[in-house]
């Protein structure tokens, strides 16, 4: 019942690691209690920083057919022996990098791993590998034959037991890498291996296994309703903008979408037949606009104040549209009871974590913009406890916490919190929001937030597209389809909006759009200038037609049981045909 424990000794490093293997009804588990790891040469600076268990388990032979299922973004496949020995092997941290560290050059823009799982698929079998404990500190590695001085194709998780940071030194000393002090924070790490026997095994088997794990042991309950399609609409209220007053440049809160204008946008869509809508309102409070910690739920006077806000919420309630006022409490400025010299996250290098902006041309720090302080996870319980209370008092029914449902980081100062500690704290915050009666919309939701999310927005439609990948698959969507309703990334944010729309409905996503009332020219030199594409008048007609087209997909609960037979461009727009009719099922107007 207790399994078997095998002790691995690394005499040169003075490290001993006992690993417990246990065979259950449908899986094999490998686990390590980190308190049992013995380190005898710590005084010499030798400590355990990373741990890989069963690194070659399920490896593909040089003459074997099969592939790895990688949950990068929407999902990707790496086929065995794909001849890409000269490309970089795959390595990525689950839930993204620890943003506490601040690189001097801009990191590559890639998708994240949102689920601590990978799959190995061969001709007549598959294996699903799931991190059961320690998912906040795990890295996924994959390499095809020839990439890692091995003739085998391998994929495995590695646990980062101690985080690292860099001291940037001047002169001839170079940069110094420093690691976390003290004992390992993560109490236990555990991985499960679920085998599946299937004559025609595929990544669908991996998705189904992980889906069952979430429903049976991950605390996830089905919330999606069959045969419904909703439009997800992101509105952006205000921002800080520099104006010249008597020749003096002054930065003021400026409205880009007031509460009355938001009502106008929504009512315009409703008038064109959009009957199911999920509305997310960003930057709707003074704190949200100015970048301070935002938890008071007080509508900004710049956008129309409480009177106009109440008119908006009354209208949305009357139309039965779901409303999620959003907050973004990742970086912050002093104010509202939180101060940068007290509440900023401390890096492993013992310095403040100041998030910098990067020059678009060269990727180095943009010195024309001030750095922003990263909010300490030690404040989260208070911040979101107050937010839940204030949202309820304001009569709101939903909340969006921004990227706090997909991003985790540690605080290595007095708080002494690792990433997994932050994950646990965030889950208690989600519970506080739910227990106050609020519905929670998760922005690009990571697995640790699945049990608490009522809806998910901004689901990735593609992978990072690394050279070692062979093709993208909708793995994320397959796992969640029929469990939690979700939307894809904003269709109008794409350079090819028509292709983005087709990809969205093909992967089972509800259509999503970003909209701002102000003209694109008004956004210049503001924090909202990246939404230059989102002027509402340009997209209203196209967006209004999208839910009807997406209904083709939602008419069946199976993601792959419908068929778009052809797509045709015409003078009026994009026509979508199905196998059931010779007439267009829907036509999207040209945008």
Regions from the PLM with identified roles:
Residues 8, 34, 55, 281-283, ...:
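Glycine-rich, histidine-containing beta strand-loop boundary motifs that form or position
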Residues 273-277, 319-323, 395-397, 436-438, ...:
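Short, well-ordered coil/turn segments that N-cap beta-strands
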Residues 229-314, 318-382, 406-410:
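Aromatic-lined carbohydrate-binding/catalytic grooves of carbohydrate-active enzymes
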Residues 32, 269, 316, 402, ...:
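Conserved, mostly hydrophobic/aromatic
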Residues 54, 268, 272, 315-319, ...:
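Structured segments of extracytoplasmic/periplasmic soluble domains
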Residues 196, 200, 252-255, 302, ...:
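Hydrophobic alpha-helical scaffolding
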Residues 120-154, 183, 332, 336-396, ...:
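Active-site-proximal substrate-binding groove within the catalytic cores of carbohydrate-active enzymes
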Residues 1-256, 263-277:
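Carbohydrate-recognition beta-sandwich/jelly-roll modules
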């Amino acid at each position: 019942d207790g399994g078997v424990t095998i002790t691995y000794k690394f005499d040169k490093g003075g490290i001993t690691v006992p690993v417990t293997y246990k065979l259950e009804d449908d899986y094999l588990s490998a686990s390590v209690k980190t308190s049992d790891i013995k380190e005898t040469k710590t005084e010499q600076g030798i400590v355990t920083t990373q741990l890989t268990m069963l690194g070659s388990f399920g490896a593909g032979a040089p003459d074997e057919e099969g592939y790895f299922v990688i949950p990068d973004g929407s999902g990707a496949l790496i086929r065995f022996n794909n001849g890409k020995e000269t490309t970089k092997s795959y390595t990525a941290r689950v839930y993204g990098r620890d943003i506490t560290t601040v690189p001097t050059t801009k990191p590559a823009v890639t998708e994240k791993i949102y689920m601590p799982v990978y799959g190995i698929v061969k001709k007549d079998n598959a294996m699903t590998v799931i991190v059961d404990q320690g998912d906040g500190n795990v890295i996924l590695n994959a390499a095809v034959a020839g990439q890692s001085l091995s003739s085998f194709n391998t994929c495995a998780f590695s646990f980062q037991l101690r985080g690292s940071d860099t001291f940037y030194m001047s002169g001839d000393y170079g940069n110094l890498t420093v690691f976390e002090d003290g004992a390992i924070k993560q109490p236990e790490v555990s991985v499960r291996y679920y085998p599946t026997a299937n004559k025609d095994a595929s990544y669908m088997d991996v998705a189904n296994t992980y889906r069952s794990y979430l429903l049976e042991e991950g605390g996830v309950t089905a919330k999606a309703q069959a045969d419904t399609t909703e439009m997800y609409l992101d509105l952006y209220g205000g921002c800080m903008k520099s104006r010249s007053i008597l020749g003096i440049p002054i930065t003021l809160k400026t409205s880009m979408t007031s509460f009355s204008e938001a009502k106008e946008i929504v009512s315009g869509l409703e008038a064109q037949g959009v009957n199911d809508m999920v509305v997310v309102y960003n930057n709707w409070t003074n704190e949200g606009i100015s970048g301070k910690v935002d938890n008071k739920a007080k509508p900004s006077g710049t956008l129309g104040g409480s009177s106009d806000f109440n008119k908006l919420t009354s209208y949305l309630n009357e139309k039965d549209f779901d409303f999620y006022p959003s907050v973004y409490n990742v970086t912050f400025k002093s104010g509202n009871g939180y101060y940068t010299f007290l509440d900023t996250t401390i890096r492993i290098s013992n310095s403040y974590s100041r998030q910098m902006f990067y020059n678009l041309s060269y990727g180095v720090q943009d010195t024309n913009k001030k750095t922003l302080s990263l909010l300490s996870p030690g404040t989260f319980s208070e911040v979101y406890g107050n937010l839940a209370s204030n949202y309820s008092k304001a009569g709101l029914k939903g909340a969006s916490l921004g990227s706090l449902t997909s991003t985790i980081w540690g605080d290595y100062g007095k708080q002494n919190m690792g990433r997994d500690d932050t994950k646990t704290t965030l889950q208690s915050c989600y519970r506080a929001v739910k227990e106050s009666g609020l519905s929670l919309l998760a922005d690009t939701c990571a697995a640790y937030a699945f049990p608490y999310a009522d809806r998910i927005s901004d689901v990735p439609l593609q992978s990072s597209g690394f050279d070692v990948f062979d093709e993208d698959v909708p793995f994320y969507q397959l796992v969640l389809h029929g469990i939690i309703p979700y939307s894809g990334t904003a269709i109008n944010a794409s350079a090819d909006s028509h292709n983005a729309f087709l990809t969205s409905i093909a992967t089972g996503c509800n259509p999503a759009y970003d909209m701002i009332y102000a003209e694109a020219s008004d956004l210049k030199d503001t924090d909202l200038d990246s939404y230059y594409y989102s002027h509402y008048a340009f997209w209203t007609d196209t967006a209004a037609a999208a839910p009807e087209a997406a209904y083709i997909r939602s008419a069946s609960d199976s993601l792959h049981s419908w068929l778009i037979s052809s797509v045709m461009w015409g003078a009026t727009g994009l026509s979508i045909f199905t196998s059931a009719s010779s007439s267009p099922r829907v036509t999207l107007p040209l945008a």
